[in-house]
UniProtKB/Swiss-Prot annotation:
Annotated coiled-coil segments of the chain: none
Keyword Lipid metabolism on entry: no
Name the UniProt record assigns to this protein: Large ribosomal subunit protein uL22
Family per record: Belongs to the universal ribosomal protein uL22 family.
GO molecular function: structural constituent of ribosome
GO cellular component, one term: cytosolic large ribosomal subunit
Family matches, as SUPFAM superfamilies: Ribosomal protein L22
A GO BP entry: cytoplasmic translation
Species, as recorded: Tetrahymena thermophila (strain SB210)
Claim: Ribonucleoprotein is one of the keywords in the record: yes
Keywords assigned: Ribonucleoprotein, Ribosomal protein
Length: 183
């Protein structure tokens, strides 16, 4: 198999790791929501989150494909009402995250500082099967597979800005007006 083309490239190739998978036999809509939920998370936090989803301690919030999705209290954590626990999609994405961490170790990057910056799920070609119906008819049985690509980049730890020592305390305009009147 040849080189995989990604839809986006990381800004710093030396500090980034990539992984992808094609023609996965998991539901496109569920996998889309799983990847959307882990985007922007630290690699270790994403793994911990997905393991909690498998244990049904936390849910995947459904934001785009919300038709006939049940409501759960676990989705309130994300400001949503609808959520699910798509175990098969979560296990596939966990495998890709394990691949990311193995790639990071091969590049000798610190996995604790890796942040998932890009995740994309595309529809794959429909898998065609058939089912036999009454009176000699045949109907299609299609499955909606997907392609997934993810990359993570090592991010330096944020340094907090020190507050200036002699900075005057800012007073809001409403407070200034009350002080001027003498109330």
């Amino acid at each position: 198999m040849g080189k995989t083309n990604y839809s986006r490239e990381p800004a710093n190739q030396a500090k980034a790791v990539k992984t992808s998978a094609s023609d996965l036999r998991v539901h496109f809509k569920n996998t889309y929501e799983v990847v959307r939920a882990i985007k922007g998370l630290n690699l270790e936090n994403a793994k911990r989150y997905l393991k909690a989803v498998i244990d049904r301690k936390r849910c995947i919030p459904f934001t785009r494909f919300t038709g006939c999705i049940g409501r759960t209290a676990q989705a309130h954590e994300f400001g949503r009402t609808q959520g699910r626990w798509p175990v098969k999609s979560v296990k596939v994405i966990l495998g890709l995250l394990d691949n990311l961490s193995a790639n990071a170790q091969a590049k000798s990057l610190n996995t604790a500082n890796l942040v998932i910056q890009h995740g994309q799920v595309n529809r794959a070609q429909k898998g065609r099967r058939r089912t036999y119906r009454a009176h000699g008819r045949i109907n299609p049985y299609l499955n909606s597979g997907c392609h997934v690509e993810i990359f993570a980049q090592e991010v330096a730890a944020k340094v907090r800005k020190e507050a200036p020592k002699d900075a005057a305390k800012k007073v809001p305009k409403t407070k200034k007006g009350k002080l001027a009147i003498g109330n």
